[in-house]
Amino acid sequence: MKRAIHALDAMLAGLTLAMGQDSPALVSFLFHALFQDERERNSDLLDPQQGITVKMFRRLVEYFLGKGYAFVSPEDLLRGVASSGRYILLTFDDGYYTNVRSIPVLEEFSVPAVFFLSTDHIQYQKSFWWDAVFRELKNRGKTLEEIVHVNAGYKRLKTTDVELCLRKEFGQAALNPVSDVDRPFTAAELKDFAAHPLVSLGNHTKDHAILTNYSDSEIQEQIHGCQDAVREMTGKSPQMIAYPNGNESPEIRKVVRDCGLQFGVLTRPGKNRLPIEAGSSEAMTLKRFTLWGDREVDAQCRISRSTMSFYRFFKDVEVQTDARLSSSRHS
């Protein structure tokens, strides 16, 4: 079903772009780990998630530059961008060491990117829990569908509780990284990485906390703690947060603003209308597209430029329905 919707979107994008409907907007893309090639992507050392290789990432940058888009950083957005422009914001979540592979591409085309950091993983050199789940269950012969189902259950818990479950089920070493592919940056590596002029840093909470699972005081600790840790390790203060798993609320956004952050990004696809005023409701809920390694890069780029999308329409309906259900449960 999803593939059929994407096929329809590809046709719709071709029609709308042929009619000149490539409106001014901020278009953002979400990445996680960067794989050197397909062999590494299929190594089962970690959850491949979107399965993006360096070659695919490079092609996306090349594509949008060829279409006249300008690449921006959070600092550019804070200074303000022209409402008549078309912009790309490249974002990487979590703090995987393999994000260093983006640097040659960023340098080749002189484009910036923002990297959202889960600081406890860096400071304590822990595997991300979903990678541990993927490794352990793959080794036990579980299918991808079964692993996704297990992860959905864990996403209802706090990170510390998930990690406790994994250590109990798979042993104390379950959250130890097994290679350079699945591990986070070290603090020393991050300091060097952060010094690059094309690198901006973002807040991703202390331990990739899905914030809607936490109390008000815990939310503050997660966001403020990450902000403090990034400053301590790099001397930089993030201007932007990526809400882990995309989960946020008006109460969470207030904490984000109180912490001095000016922008927040979701995992929900869509174009962001201009202008974007720092600290506004729109600035705190910027949408991001996800690039997938099993689909043609150019086709996905065209879909993201289009003003119309069946997939985005259905996702918006799903989000609105979930919000109404959540509101009714808490009323």
Report the location of each language-model feature.
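C-terminal active-site subregion of NodB/CE4 polysaccharide deacetylases
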Residues: 1-91, 97-99, 128, 134, ...
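Metal-dependent polysaccharide deacetylase catalytic core of the NodB/CE4 family, i.e.
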Residues: 29-35, 85-88, 109-247, 285-286
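Short, glycine/acidic-enriched loop or turn micro-motifs at the edges of active sites
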Residues: 96-97, 207
